[in-house]
């Protein structure tokens, strides 16, 4: 089995990313290779950190649209009130002060692979970043939703932050006999266990709050549970059997946020108290400039995570 050691990692000098990297051999005249990392989530921040820890004099610049990162991991506990938003809000200060990573807040607009330049839109105008290696870890975007979906009315809460707070407030407003509807996107999507975990946490919340008769309906666009099927099947049919209804093969046909109604290939629901619609997903933002496959994601090497597009 091939061992991808530190030397191999540094040879790729930034080719490891959540989606893609565009490598170029660094000329002998360059003594301090420049790596630009787009996306300050777990993928991008980890790459930036370890390039500085292992890379000697590598210059690393991290680009993100936000001044800090709000973790999707554990955000379901914010929805149920078990954690505060501050507990999942992660700053970039340690990357800067401890690891020497430069940070630029802005939106990556365009990649010039021939010129090794990245255009970033910042509050002060566009900036051009020159690089020897580019790492793209931009997270996800949502595929267009059918019907009239307004996330400010029927939140996805699949990108943590204001959406998490909105869903939390809607859940807190539920009363006896109310219905919480959550959709599971068509695979592949980010964090396969996430929707099922959220359904279980919501069901337990409703139990603990004494919301008699309140239930959770899980509309899964897939033929079956996409992660830990044995555990979640037991959760749905035993632990939370009185509160969770699991519906597979429920491809979403239309969403109407104004009435909190949804039409699927398996069943239709009108006037849910909470409609947590999680759309189908694809590679985020600038990653699409590399070329995506039929599923909407970028093909990468399993050894280096370098793009195959």
Predicted regions mapped to residue ranges:
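FAD-site-proximal beta/loop scaffold in flavoenzymes
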Residues: 149-176, 270-309
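Glycine-rich dinucleotide-binding loop and its adjacent helix/turn
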Residues: 138-209
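N-terminal secretory signal peptides and thylakoid transit peptides that target proteins
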Residues: 1-20
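Beta1-alpha1 glycine-rich phosphate/pyrophosphate-binding loop at the start
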Residues: 29-102, 186-227
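A short, basic/flexible loop-to-alpha-helix module at the beginning of a structural domain
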Residues: 18-31
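Short glycine-rich anion-binding loops that position phosphate/pyrophosphate groups of nucleotides
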Residues: 43, 139-142, 281-282
């Amino acid at each position: 089995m091939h061992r991808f050691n530190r030397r191999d990692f540094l040879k790729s000098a930034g080719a490891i990313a959540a989606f893609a990297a565009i490598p170029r051999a660094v000329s002998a005249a360059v003594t301090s290779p420049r790596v630009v990392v787009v996306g300050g989530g777990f993928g991008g921040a980890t790459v930036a950190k370890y390039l500085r820890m292992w890379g000697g004099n590598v210059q690393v610049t991290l680009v993100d649209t936000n001044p800090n990162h709000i973790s999707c991991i554990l955000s379901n506990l914010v929805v149920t009130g078990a954690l505060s938003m501050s507990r999942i809000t992660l700053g970039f200060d340690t990357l800067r002060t401890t690891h020497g990573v430069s940070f630029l807040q802005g939106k990556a607009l365009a990649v010039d692979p021939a010129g090794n330049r990245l255009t970033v839109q910042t509050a002060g105008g566009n900036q051009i970043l020159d690089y020897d290696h580019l790492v793209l870890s931009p997270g996800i975007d949502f595929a267009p939703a059918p019907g009239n979906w307004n996330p400010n009315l029927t939140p996805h809460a699949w990108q943590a932050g204001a959406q998490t707070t909105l869903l939390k407030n809607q859940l807190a407003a539920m009363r006896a006999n109310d219905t919480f509807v959550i959709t599971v996107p068509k695979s592949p999507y980010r964090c396969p266990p996430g929707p099922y975990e959220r359904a279980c946490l919501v069901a337990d919340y409703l139990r603990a709050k004494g919301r008699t008769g309140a239930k959770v309906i899980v509309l899964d666009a897939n033929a079956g549970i996409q992660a830990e099927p044995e555990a979640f099947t037991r959760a749905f049919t035993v632990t939370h059997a009185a509160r969770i209804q699991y519906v597979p093969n429920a491809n979403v046909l239309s969403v109407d946020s104004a009435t909190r109604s949804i039409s699927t290939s398996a069943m239709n629901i009108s006037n849910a108290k909470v409609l947590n619609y999680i759309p189908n997903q694809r590679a985020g933002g600038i990653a699409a400039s590399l070329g995506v496959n039929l599923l909407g994601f970028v093909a990468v090497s399993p050894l280096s995570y370098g793009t195959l597009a």
